[in-house]
């Protein structure tokens, strides 16, 4: 490994120190549900499958200076595998996003499942979007990709 080395008296001696970083003040907000986080790893003693489960709840927050803009977000993620059979690996994720202001609300739920066989990676995904509790958009994907050395 050959790395460049600067000689003494190089241009760095003439450089000025960086100034303090600038940034906007945090937004004023009202928290109506605190955020939460859970993370666990389990082993099914009968099947031997190892599962990692992560739950992220970003809470419920209303931004005071933005006309009551309210935001909620949760992510529920599972990753599992059998140590002796990596082809049984599975990723299962559900994300929920919700936004509202006054008498308007919109939310989305996405669910993605990734599995594999000896020859391909399979992806199943679903999306549901609601406006004021009415479903306004749905879509489903069913895809398969060659493993290509994976």
Regions found by a protein language model. Give the residues of each.
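Glycine/threonine-rich phosphate-binding loop and adjacent beta-strand/alpha-helix elements that clamp
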Residues: 1-150
């Amino acid at each position: 490994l050959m790395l460049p080395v600067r000689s003494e008296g190089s241009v760095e001696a003439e450089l000025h120190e960086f100034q303090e970083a600038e940034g906007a003040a945090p937004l004023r907000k009202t928290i109506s549900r605190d955020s939460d986080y859970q993370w666990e790893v389990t082993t099914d003693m009968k099947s031997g499958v190892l599962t990692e489960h992560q739950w992220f709840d970003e809470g419920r927050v209303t931004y005071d200076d933005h006309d009551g803009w309210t935001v909620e977000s949760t992510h529920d993620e599972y990753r599992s595998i059998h140590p002796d059979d990596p082809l049984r690996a599975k990723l299962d994720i559900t994300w929920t996003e919700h936004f509202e202001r006054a008498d308007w609300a919109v939310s989305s739920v996405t669910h993605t499942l990734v599995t594999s066989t000896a020859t391909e990676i399979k992806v199943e995904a679903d999306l549901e979007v609601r406006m004021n509790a009415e479903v306004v958009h749905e879509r489903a994907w069913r895809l398969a990709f060659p493993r290509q050395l994976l």
